[in-house]
């Protein structure tokens, strides 16, 4: 299943994407708002990639390898929908991470719209959520641009900064498009 947007080419993540996953998730800059920090080594990236591949097999959706349509062989990010317990009632999570070289171009917003379209139109989901560090203003703006509303906050033991919980239901998404 491949999705193309105005500028993006999205395809299910594959084992051949390991080097790209490691380059993006091992970069400390892409983890400025993630207290867990960057992936420590390529073996850790492999373990994460293996879990993402299993999620595709189990659920029929998961992280996409994100490329520009003009260069579909070059992975510039990963993101999509995953089953992840957000809080007591929400378990479908929108997430994304892009290479620093493409930050500030509106690609996260374009990916978020595509993921929401896919989730509501193809998967027939009722609700999609996202969590973001409360101080990650750029990512919060992305979620707000696609119509997600903040519905709560999560405090995490050992972390000074909590996460904001955003959500959108299918009907609201239809009115945003």
Regions found by a protein language model. Give the residues of each.
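Active-site rim helix/loop that mediates acceptor-substrate recognition in acyltransferases
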Residues: 38-60
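Acyl-donor (CoA/ACP) binding surface of acyl/acetyltransferases
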Residues: 1-32, 37, 50, 63-177
